From Swiss-Prot:
GO terms for MF: orotidine-5'-phosphate decarboxylase activity
Species: Xanthomonas oryzae pv. oryzae (strain KACC10331 / KXO85)
Active site (catalytic residues): K71 (proton donor)
Pathway the protein contributes to: Pyrimidine metabolism; UMP biosynthesis via de novo pathway; UMP from orotate: step 2/2
Residues annotated as binding substrate: 19, 41, 69-78, 124, 185, 194, 214-215
Keywords for the protein's UniProt record, in alphabetical order: Decarboxylase, Lyase, Pyrimidine biosynthesis
Pfam families, alphabetized: OMPdecase (PF00215)
UniProt similarity note: Belongs to the OMP decarboxylase family. Type 1 subfamily.
Protein's recorded name: Orotidine 5'-phosphate decarboxylase
Role, per record: Catalyzes the decarboxylation of orotidine 5'-monophosphate (OMP) to uridine 5'-monophosphate (UMP).
């Protein structure tokens, strides 16, 4: 059974995707954004830099929440061992692929409540043609909800999924199940590699607990102001005390 969603203040519901190649660039972004962002996602690009855990430690020392987005996908024993080691670090969220029930169960058993584990369902860069090319001739929403239910049954705490599926996931799963949505585009659709996108208010109206935003902040003329504007939208959508 999944646990209650991670208690989040309104300003912690914006997660900035720290998709940069080095420790120095990562910390420069944290300093640039200041109090406008309290939660950071660190992924594979920083892992390849060799400085991943230096960044994680630096974020923790700045009292920032950390989302480890490495999408673990391996045999159950390997994933379980990785989760046990990662649980020693100050991590709030961590992703595992949601396509193998035995692996999900092993991850949940190894976690012992240290982090909130999120199952990756269908990447927001994928649409129905991409699923069909993998031999899955179904709508993304149907696959996402199926994966969310399997993750919940395995004891995983939530999913990372497009805001387009937040409503169906919320209706299908229990109130303790966390929904974190990437592919958020505050200014509306743009020409990039994300396909299944929504706006800030819509994601929270449909049941998201937190959103991941990268390029709309990173490419803004004033990134801190862009983050602050998103924070204002979140506060209007969820209020100060929703958890």
């Amino acid at each position: 059974m999944s646990r209650a969603p991670l208690p989040l203040a309104a300003h912690e519901r914006l997660i900035f995707a720290l998709d940069v190649p080095s420790h120095d660039e990562a910390i420069a972004w944290v300093d640039r954004l200041g109090d406008s962002v309290a939660f950071y996602k660190i992924g594979m690009e920083l892992l390849a830099s060799g400085e991943y855990f230096h960044v994680l430690d630096a974020l923790a020392k700045r009292d920032k929440r950390v989302f480890v987005d490495l999408k673990f996908f391996d045999i159950p024993a390997t994933v379980a061992g990785t989760i046990r080691r990662l649980a020693q670090w100050p991590v709030s969220y961590c992703t595992v692929h949601g396509w193998h029930a035995g692996m999900l169960q092993a991850a949940a058993d190894a976690n012992h409540g240290a982090m909130r584990l999120l199952a990756v369902t269908v990447l927001t860069s994928m649409g129905r043609p991409d699923l069909a090319a993998m031999g899955i001739d179904r709508e993304p929403v149907d696959v996402v909800v199926e994966r969310a239910l399997a993750a919940e049954a395995a004891g995983i705490d939530g999913v990372i999924a497009s805001g387009q599926e937040a409503g169906p996931i919320r209706r299908a799963t229990g109130p303790a199940f966390s929904i974190v949505c990437p592919g958020i585009r505050p200014g509306g659709p743009v020409a990039d590699d994300q396909q299944r996108i929504v706006g800030v208010a819509q994601a929270f109206t449909d049941g998201a607990d937190a959103i991941v935003v990268g390029r709309p902040i990173r490419l803004a003329a004033d990134p801190a102001a862009a983050a602050a504007a998103i924070q204002a939208e979140i506060l209007a959508a969820v209020g100060q005390d929703r958890s």
